[in-house]
C-alpha cells in the first residue's frame, strides 16, 4: 500500500481529497495542530491522524519520512505579508527540502488561478505574489535542489491552479446566500471580477489523477482547474440568492460599488472580527481575471469533464 502525507487535509478541499485517496487504496497520514480538527475524517480506514505543527521544520521532516507522496493544500486567503510568506512560500520550501531529504517521489501542490511563478512580483496582491513565489520554490526543487539546503534528487511535481472552489460546505456561495438572508440589498465590491468556479469533487479527483500519473505533461507540470462557465462576482452573488429561494426566487438586489467605495467596504470588512468576507488584498487579487488562461492544460488533460455550477449548487443552497 502506497503511503501519502496530506498537508491541509482537514480543510474544505482536503477532506474530499482524503476520502478519495482512501478509496483508491492509499495509506493517508493527516497531520493537524489539533486532533479534533480531523474528527469528521477519523472514521476513514487507512487514515492516520497525527498532532503536528507542519510549520516546524523538524516535525515536518519526521512526518514526511517514509512517505511515497505528499499533497500540499495549506493556504490562507487573509493575512499580512508575513503570514502569506510563512504559509505560501516558507512552508513549500520546507516541504521541498523534506521531500528531497527523504526521497519522496511525488508532490501535488494546490496553488491558485491567476498567479505566475515566473514573474510573481508583477502581481497585484500579497496572496497572488506569495502563491507564485511558492510555486517557483517548488519548481526549482523538483529539478533537484532547494537553495541553501544542500539536498538533491528531484521529484515529480504537479501544480494545480483552481479557480474559486464551490461545494456543499464552501465558504463562497453559502456565504453569499447567508448575507442575502440578512440584508435586503447587497452593495458589492469587485462586482465585475471574473471567476470560473470549479467543483470541489473535480479538484479532489484531479489530485488523485495526478498521483496516478494521468497527466501526459512532463514534470514540473501546471494544470488549470476551472468549471465550464465564466461568471462575474455579481452574477455569482445573484445566483446564490436565486438558488436559495430568496427574494421570491429572484435573489436580493445587488449593485456594484465604485472603486473608492469598494476599497472602503473591503477595508472595513477586513477589520471585522473573525474571518473576513473580503479584504483589500482580496480586492487586489480580483484585478486578475480568475479564469483559464489557455496557457496550461486543464481538467480534460486528466480525463475529467468539468461540472457545471448551477445544478450542483442548487442541491445545497435550495431552501437554506
Where are these regions (language model features)?
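Flexible, glycine-rich beta-alpha linker
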Residues: 158-175
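A short C-terminal helix-loop "cap" of Rossmann-like NAD(P)-dependent dehydrogenase/epimerase domains
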Residues: 176-190
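Mid/C-terminal beta-alpha module of Rossmann-like enzyme folds, strongest
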Residues: 210-279, 293-320
Amino acid at each position: 500500500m502506497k503511503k501519502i502525507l496530506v498537508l491541509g487535509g482537514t480543510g474544505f478541499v482536503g477532506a474530499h481529497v482524503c476520502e478519495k485517496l482512501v478509496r483508491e487504496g492509499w495509506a493517508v497520514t493527516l497531520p493537524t495542530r489539533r486532533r479534533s480538527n480531523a474528527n469528521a475524517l477519523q472514521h476513514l480506514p487507512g487514515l492516520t491522524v497525527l498532532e503536528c505543527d507542519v510549520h516546524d521544520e523538524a516535525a515536518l521532516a519526521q512526518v514526511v519520512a517514509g512517505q511515497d507522496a505528499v499533497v500540499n493544500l495549506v493556504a490562507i486567503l487573509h493575512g499580512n505579508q508575513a503570514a502569506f510568506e510563512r504559509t505560501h512560500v516558507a512552508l513549500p520550501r520546507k516541504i521541498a527540502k523534506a521531500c528531497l531529504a527523504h526521497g519522496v517521489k511525488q508532490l501535488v501542490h494546490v496553488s491558485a488561478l491567476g498567479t505566475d511563478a515566473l514573474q510573481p512580483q508583477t502581481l497585484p496582491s500579497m496572496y497572488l505574489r506569495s502563491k507564485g513565489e511558492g510555486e517557483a520554490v517548488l519548481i526549482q526543487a523538483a529539478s533537484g535542489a532547494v537553495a541553501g539546503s544542500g539536498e538533491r534528487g528531484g521529484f515529480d511535481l504537479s501544480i494545480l491552479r483552481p479557480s474559486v472552489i464551490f461545494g456543499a460546505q464552501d465558504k463562497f456561495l453559502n456565504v453569499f446566500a447567508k448575507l442575502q438572508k440578512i440584508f435586503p440589498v447587497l452593495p458589492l465590491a469587485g462586482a465585475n471580477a471574473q471567476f470560473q468556479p470549479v467543483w470541489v469533487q473535480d479538484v479532489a479527483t484531479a489530485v488523485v489523477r495526478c498521483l496516478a500519473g494521468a497527466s501526459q505533461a512532463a514534470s514540473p507540470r501546471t494544470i488549470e482547474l476551472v468549471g465550464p462557465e465564466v461568471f462575474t462576482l455579481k452574477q455569482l452573488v445573484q445566483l446564490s440568492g436565486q438558488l436559495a429561494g430568496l427574494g421570491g426566487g429572484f435573489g436580493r438586489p445587488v449593485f456594484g460599488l465604485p472603486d473608492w467605495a469598494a476599497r472602503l467596504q473591503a477595508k472595513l470588512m477586513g477589520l471585522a472580527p473573525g474571518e473576513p468576507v473580503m479584504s483589500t488584498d482580496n480586492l487586489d487579487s480580483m484585478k486578475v481575471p480568475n479564469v483559464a488562461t489557455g496557457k496550461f492544460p486543464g481538467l480534460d488533460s486528466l480525463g475529467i469533464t468539468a461540472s457545471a455550477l448551477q445544478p450542483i449548487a442548487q442541491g445545497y443552497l435550495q431552501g437554506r
